[in-house]
């Protein structure tokens, strides 16, 4: 995975990306959802149990309706973002995610995505051990 480039999520079966260990390099990784994952999910996670994600996500609640947005921020200890296709955590074509290695142990992650409807939920979680 190259920093300063855009990585496309392009598989209907989803993709799992593991970010490098956060050391404060200033490297920025950008992801675009080019294909909606219809099984599994597109997942971005940190490299180890000590790195965490800061940041926030803006999600358009329903791709068929304008003007309805949901916002979430990462909780302390969150280390994973999951974009489950047409489900409630986003993952529809056109979504954009950016993760910056801004200091040792910390990633700043922002995302702008859409969901297919339903009861939307945060894509942030703590799964790396």
Model segments located where?
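Exposed extracellular interaction/assembly regions and N-terminal maturation sites
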Residues: 1-70, 100-129
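Structured beta-strand segments within beta-sheet-rich domains
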Residues: 68-95
């Amino acid at each position: 995975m190259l920093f300063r480039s855009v990585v496309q999520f392009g598989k209907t079966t989803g993709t799992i990306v593991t970010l490098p260990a956060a050391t404060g390099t200033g490297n920025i990784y950008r992801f675009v959802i080019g294909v909606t994952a219809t099984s599994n999910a597109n997942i971005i996670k940190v490299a180890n149990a000590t790195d965490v994600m800061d940041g926030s996500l803006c999600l358009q609640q329903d791709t068929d309706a304008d003007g309805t947005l949901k916002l979430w921020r990462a909780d302390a200890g969150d280390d994973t973002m999951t974009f489950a296709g047409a489900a409630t955590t986003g993952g529809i074509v056109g979504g954009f995610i950016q993760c910056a290695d801004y200091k040792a142990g910390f990633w700043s992650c922002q995302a702008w995505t859409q969901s297919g409807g339903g009861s939307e939920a945060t894509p942030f979680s703590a799964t790396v051990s």
